[in-house]
Amino acid sequence: MGIFSRLQSLFNVFMTTDTHYVGRFAPSPSGPLHFGSLIAALGSYLQARSQQGKWLVRIEDLDPPREIRGAADDILRTLEAYGLTWDGSVMYQSQRHGAYQDQIDQWLHGGDAYYCQCTRKQIKTAGGFYPGTCRHLHRSAENSAVRLNVDTPITYFVDRLHGQIDIPATLAQEDFIIRRRDGLYAYNLAVVLDDIEQNITEVVRGADLIEPTGRQIGLYRQLQHPEVSYLHLPLAVTDNGNKLSKQNHAPAIDKSHPVPALIAAMSFLGMTPPATLIKEELKDVLQWGINAWCIDNLPKMTEIILTKTH
């Protein structure tokens, strides 16, 4: 093989392994999927499939006290019932604790993280944002949280739907927790390490997760890893302003009749499904969605009030 052919082969490998779209849906097993969950799942699925990309599923079982027995399996069965088939195997955060701890240990040993014993009450008294009290106090590991040194704050990021998102300086500068005092690993650390492990290229999720995005970008830079792009979908809220959520007892979507809920979710996401689509097979409904998907049609809002919950 000549030098040109070898270079071309290397280029092809690079293009197929490093630039291929990989998206994901990462629910927490705190209850069944509801209409708000379906919006996030469908939006991330259509964004991936419309680019012939991979769509992965990760179960974020990071907080056992909030989890409901059997919810993870129920979520997966619901995705299957809705035709939202994923690529590869499902990742479970409960099986990734070793990776999280290894990274924390590396940062602790390198001086990039430290133990903190400040209480929520103390932080509230200090103004609501952590002022770095324990950064140079060499606290013991016992009864301590672990915080990351934030020496280069992320003051803004660009969202693919909402444009530039500015982050308040007090929030951007805060040394944030990467392992809680009770020993549980923080969401921001886990989600970034998992997205890197799964080669995620873009995160499509609900707008309720806009705020922690700056911290997640900061973790990518701390890890010297290229950050993903972000697209935050509008949230479905009730007329009193509450987000549809498991905590607010949003009803589970119907596994036995997926097409009406899928069409409603497509409409919520700015698509215009034809009236005849309700009569089509599930696979044809999803294929219509893949063909019609365009992020330019997404409502540029962080919340949309539903007149009816699903």
Curated annotation (Swiss-Prot):
Motif extent ('HIGH' region): 27-37
Entry cofactors: Zn(2+)
Alphabetic keyword roster: Aminoacyl-tRNA synthetase, ATP-binding, Ligase, Metal-binding, Nucleotide-binding, Zinc
MF (Gene Ontology): ATP binding; glutamate-tRNA ligase activity; zinc ion binding
Membrane-spanning parts: none
Binding-site residues, ATP: 246
Binding site for Zn(2+): 116, 118, 130, 134
The organism's place on the tree of life at top rank: Bacteria
Cofactor binding summary note: Binds 1 zinc ion per subunit.
EC class name: ligase
Motif extent ('KMSKS' region): 243-247
Enzyme Commission code: 6.1.1.-
Disulfide bonds: none
GO CC, alphabetical: cytosol
Annotated binding of L-glutamate, by residue: 24-28, 60, 187, 205
Stored InterPro entries: Glu-Q_tRNA(Asp)_Synthase, Glu/Gln-tRNA-synth, Glu/Gln-tRNA-synth_Ib_cat-dom, GluQ/Sye, Rossmann-like_a/b/a_fold
UniProt-listed GO biological process terms: glutamyl-tRNA aminoacylation; tRNA modification
UniProt family annotation: Belongs to the class-I aminoacyl-tRNA synthetase family. GluQ subfamily.
Biological role: Catalyzes the tRNA-independent activation of glutamate in presence of ATP and the subsequent transfer of glutamate onto a tRNA(Asp). Glutamate is transferred on the 2-amino-5-(4,5-dihydroxy-2-cyclopenten-1-yl) moiety of the queuosine in the wobble position of the QUC anticodon.
Record-given protein name: Glutamyl-Q tRNA(Asp) synthetase
Species of the source: Photobacterium profundum (strain SS9)
Gene name of the record: gluQ
